[in-house]
Each structure stands twice: as structure tokens, then as C-alpha cells.
Amino acid sequence: MTEKEQDLILTHLTLVESLINQVGYQKGVVGMEFEDLYQIGCIALCKAAAHYRPDRGATFKTYACRVIRNMLQDHREHAS
């Protein structure tokens, strides 16, 4: 992981908890604890940092939110 990717992750780490709360994940709702969802969100944030392309026009925050939300939704669907 590059230093730039690490900076993006550390700067935007609060997005993970925010998105978990926004999408309405509550303890036990999808059979996963908050800590599990947080871990999935952090993995998604790392993935977003690794694949982010600023030349595509989106801010990192916008891109990361999409990647995190999609990964959380995928896990919710597979847990159902």
C-alpha cells in the first residue's frame, strides 16, 4: 500500500461508521455484529484507495462511499 493510499484511508476512515449507520445496519439485523460490518467497510475503503482514479472525475469520498456501500449491501444479501 502506498503512502498516498494510506493517507486516503486515514482521512476517510469515519466514512465507514457513517455509512453503516446511514444504511440502517443495526446489531443483529443482518446476522452480523457492528464490528464485523466495520471490518467489511474498512476492507472496502482499502479497496477504494487502491483502485481510485482521480482522472475519472469523482472525488475520493464519492468513490469510496459507493465502494463501501456496495460491499456492505453484498454482505447483507449473502447473509440473508
Regions found by a protein language model. Give the residues of each.
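Alpha-helical promoter-recognition and RNA polymerase-docking modules of transcription initiation factors
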Residues: 1-80
